[in-house]
Amino acid sequence: MFVSDLRHFLDLPDDAPGPARKMAEQLGNVVRAATAAGAGTAWVSALPCRRRPGRRPCPGHIVVFRPDLPARIEWRCDSCGDGGVISGWEGSYFDLRAPPRPRRPNETVADFVVPEEVAAVLRDVLLLDPDCERLVYRARATDDGVVLSADGDELDELLGFVAAEANHEPNRRRQQHLDRAFAALSDALQTMGS
């Protein structure tokens, strides 16, 4: 079990070793996932496990649990069992807790499935507002793919951020990934509209 205080990973110096930076990124993503959804229930996030047992990528996803009283976040892989506890996350820029956005009476929230590659691209979008960031990090892993839950307005807003980043991306390969994510989200939005 990896016991960590997120405050130790927040402002790493420029010369910090690569493994420390990767661990800081993973812990930050776990905190984002755990705080993007409600407290009190363990759930399987779309975050992939970073371990490589037998020098092969672990196929598991990270299960997160945040108790009602914010003290620590527990996480573990649903496949290999790797896990830990994170403290010192409250108030950090990874903390996505916020009151839910008020919904209009006629708004319906729909679940839609996207491939894991699309979910990974969405987590790498650099400019997201807090509502879209919560949408991306509360995605759940299933056997069919990654399930995002959103209403039409949330999905449309996320599409705008993905399109803006794709239009300004100089790396052709990353732009293609963003374009595929945009196409998958557009299909989901059209499905919601019909």
Q: Locations of the language-model features?
A:
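Short, intrinsically disordered terminal segments enriched in charged and Pro/Gly residues
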Residues: M1-S45, W89-R103
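Short cysteine/histidine-rich metal-coordination sites, predominantly Zn2+-binding motifs
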Residues: V64-W75, S92-R101
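Short recognition patches in nucleic-acid-associated and regulatory proteins
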Residues: P48-D68
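Positively charged, low-complexity terminal tracts
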Residues: F2-V3, W89, F94-S194
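Short cysteine-rich clusters marking metal-coordination/redox-active sites
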Residues: A46-R52, C77-C80
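Flanking scaffold residues of small Cys/His-coordinated metal-binding clusters
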Residues: T41-R50, A71-R72
